[in-house]
Amino acid sequence: MSGKLRLYKEKLEGYNRFYSIVKTIKMVTLAKYRAAQGRIRTRDFSLRYTELAFSKPQASRDAVAAAKNALVYIPITTNRGSCGALNSNIVRCIDSVVSSKMVLMPVGKRGIDSFSKLYPDEFRYGIINDMKESMHFGYATFVIENAYEVSKDADRYQVIFNRFVSAGVQRNAVYNIPSYEKWKEDLADAASSDNQKNRYLFANALQNEEEQLIRDFFDFHAALAVLNAVGENELSEQAARLVAVEGQLTNISSLQQRTSSLYNKTRQFGITAALIEILSAMSSLEGNAMKGVRRNKFWEGAVTK
């Protein structure tokens, strides 16, 4: 009995320590989640002009199918564990668009480990972020510049990431960034025809500027799209991690309650058994006293009255 009681007690102490550790992780994750949520709050305002520049930030199936040159895919993955199925969803998204034109440049350690084994021919190299600092414009510029270097004659650059919808829902999203030459052709078409009426004034105003300014404008909004993608993925990561940690706390609480119940029942059973033995001994002593059993000295035999 004492061995089983000691086992339950050690288990309960271990669960209590584990619960305190996971609760601390939850508080840290919640703070990071709120910080990332504040940074991504301006996404609808900042992407308004990026959408106008690229017409459609989301991937266009027709444009991708009509591409003659390479298509650079930039899947953004997470480095941390306990983030749900974020990385698996990114891998499934890449599986659905595999083609002979695909070139991979993943972002994140787990993405590099996975895609270098799954698609060794399409994989070029990846970018690792230690995630010690929040996502910033300089990092996004570094990502898009390396994407240009991976395939200089690529038609399009597809940034695949997890878009934050709510704390419990994250969905795959794609930003479709054309090459500079393709973008200029599309800009000229928008400025000279009525095919894109919503971009007519914008295209004409930009066409009147110098070539270097147009190039800087393109690079700025391409980096801004990447910045939004990595920021969204960071927020989705913290949200998924928060939900996973909450599930861990629920599981640990149920284990604590179950072990505490077993510990209390075992302890109660041991106390009850000890009380029964004491009461039995007292009853037998009282019975002997009533029969007149007397012993003057402990080494002498009992003498009956």
Swiss-Prot record:
Annotated membrane topology is:
Peripheral membrane protein
Note whether Transport occurs among the keywords: yes
UniProt feature coiled coil, ranges: none
Q: List the disulfide bonds.
A: none
Q: Which Pfam families match?
A: ATP-synt
The record's subcellular location field reads: Mitochondrion; Mitochondrion inner membrane
GO cellular component, as recorded: mitochondrial inner membrane; proton-transporting ATP synthase complex
Main subcellular location of this protein, as a coarse class? mitochondrion
Where does the chain cross the membrane?
none
- Give the matching InterPro entries: ATP_synth_F1_ATPase_gsu, ATP_synth_F1_gsu
Q: Which SUPFAM superfamilies match?
A: ATP synthase (F1-ATPase), gamma subunit (SSF52943)
Protein task: Mitochondrial membrane ATP synthase (F(1)F(o) ATP synthase) produces ATP from ADP in the presence of a proton gradient across the membrane which is generated by electron transport complexes of the respiratory chain. F-type ATPases consist of two structural domains, F(1) - containing the extramembraneous catalytic core, and F(o) - containing the membrane proton channel, linked together by a central stalk and a peripheral stalk. During catalysis, ATP synthesis in the catalytic domain of F(1) is coupled via a rotary mechanism of the central stalk subunits to proton translocation.
| Record text on subunit structure and interactions | F-type ATPases have 2 components, F(1) - the catalytic core - and F(o) - the membrane proton channel. F(1) has five subunits: alpha(3), beta(3), gamma(1), delta(1), epsilon(1), plus the additional subunit P18 (Tb427.05.1710) that is not present in F(1)F(o) ATP synthase from metazoa. Subunit P18 (Tb927.5.1710) interacts with the alpha subunit with a 1:1 stoichiometry; the interaction is direct. Subunit gamma is part of the central stalk. F(o) has three main subunits: a, b and c.
Q: Which protein are we looking at? A: ATP synthase subunit gamma, mitochondrial
Source organism: Trypanosoma brucei brucei
